[in-house]
């Protein structure tokens, strides 16, 4: 009897155990598609990014015009650039849906997988931030100035740290060069961490909508979920191409079509849509250091999710109180995203402050209490 190379070859064996013969719960829904979509996004962003880097010049006198040159003169440069810019938006859309699924179905109880995933989110946010600076438009320049300046709120070492990151006394050529370096380097770090993320996941196997042990009912990943993932992939690419080909600048900022000018501040400095919720939390606190801490905590709170789980049940599927809180949290995040894009004036200030307090209250106080109440209702 001939041995199956797929199951014996050292390299093929790894791929086989991860993507072909992987035992998967039979009842995982479309919410479990986002992992593969994120992997696809990462590959797509890396490929388009490498092609852009071939034509980009990380110098303040050339950066803006090199991006214009890519979109005008390079073969399909407009397509590569628009796919890279909108691909980032789609990447974050998938990340947020993936995290939302993790919170709803209690996937955070796989602590190692959850912690590597949250670290991946932080790295992706850092990559997106330094990448946004590279076209050297007005919003790139002022976004870099405002966000890096937040570090000056750190007591004692703040100002030194900011100047160290800038490579001078303001955002200048040295800053752009190092941001380009980080933007090129970080995705490969993300890839390494993604492998760890999968490694930890395959130690435990996937969670499922019921939150119960599914060892008695597993099916092979291929063909069932490989085709299901392929459908998700086709839908995602359709959305990406629709954005890229019909509405390439829909999610961008018009200010970034103006070259960076240190002498003229844009009327409203705001980041890309996927950072607006955190930006709203930052702005809702009148104290600089307090704002920076709230901004950090808005993401780092995810690390606390396993410790805040009080329910006897894993998922939110059969927990009406927590369900109400979960969807309130989603609505609250949408409100924060809207507020982040609005000017700092009434009534937006107070709405932002209420939404920020609610965000932390739901995650840190109300959800654990709801879990305990639901436990009481069970007995």
Swiss-Prot record:
It is a multi-pass membrane protein. Heme b b566 binds at residues 98, 197. Heme b b562 binds at residues 84, 183. Binds 2 heme b groups non-covalently. Its main location: mitochondrion. Gene3D superfamilies: Cytochrome Bc1 Complex, Chain C. It is found in: Mitochondrion inner membrane. Its cofactor is heme b. Keywords: Electron transport, Heme, Iron, Membrane, Metal-binding, Mitochondrion, Mitochondrion inner membrane, Respiratory chain, Transmembrane, Transmembrane helix, Transport, Ubiquinone. GO terms for cellular component: mitochondrial inner membrane; respiratory chain complex III. The chain crosses the membrane at residues 34-54, 78-99, 114-134, 179-199, 227-247, 289-309, 321-341, 348-368. CDD domains: cytochrome_b_C (cd00290), Cytochrome_b_N (cd00284). A ubiquinone binds at residue 202. Heme 1 (or BL or b562) is low-potential and absorbs at about 562 nm, and heme 2 (or BH or b566) is high-potential and absorbs at about 566 nm. Belongs to the cytochrome b family. The cytochrome bc1 complex contains 3 respiratory subunits (MT-CYB, CYC1 and UQCRFS1), 2 core proteins (UQCRC1 and UQCRC2) and probably 6 low-molecular weight proteins. Component of the ubiquinol-cytochrome c reductase complex (complex III or cytochrome b-c1 complex) that is part of the mitochondrial respiratory chain. The b-c1 complex mediates electron transfer from ubiquinol to cytochrome c. Contributes to the generation of a proton gradient across the mitochondrial membrane that is then used for ATP synthesis. This is Cytochrome b. It comes from Terrapene carolina (Eastern box turtle). The gene is MT-CYB.
